[in-house]
Amino acid sequence: MAHKKGQGASRNGRDSESKRLGLKVGAGQRVSTGSILVRQRGTKWHPAVNVGRGKDDTLFALVDGIVVMKKTDRTYVSVIPQA
C-alpha cells in the first residue's frame, strides 16, 4: 500500500466563510424602523419592547428610537421611541 498520496493532493485549505453574527447596534444608539440590532443563531439576546424577531432569530427595530439592553435571567433588547 502506498503511504504517499501522489502529487497535487492537498488535504488542507478548507474553512467556512464567517457569518458576521453578533450585535450590530450598541445600547444608547439611535435606530430607525427595520434596523437590524442583532444577528444570532438561537436566542442569545431576546426581543423586548418594540423589537421584532425574524425566522433566523435576527432582532430588528419596530420603531424609530434608542436601543436599551437589560440583563436579568436573559438579555433583553428593546427600543424606546423618540419623537
From Swiss-Prot:
High-level lineage: Bacteria, Pseudomonadati, Chlamydiota, Chlamydiia, Chlamydiales
PANTHER family xref list: LARGE RIBOSOMAL SUBUNIT PROTEIN BL27M, RIBOSOMAL PROTEIN L27
Keywords per UniProt: Ribonucleoprotein, Ribosomal protein
Region (Disordered): 1-25
Family the UniProt entry places it in: Belongs to the bacterial ribosomal protein bL27 family.
Single GO term (MF): structural constituent of ribosome
This protein's GO CC annotations: cytosolic large ribosomal subunit
Protein name (database record): Large ribosomal subunit protein bL27
Short name of one Pfam family: Ribosomal_L27
Biological-process GO terms, alphabetical: translation
UniProt gene name: rpmA
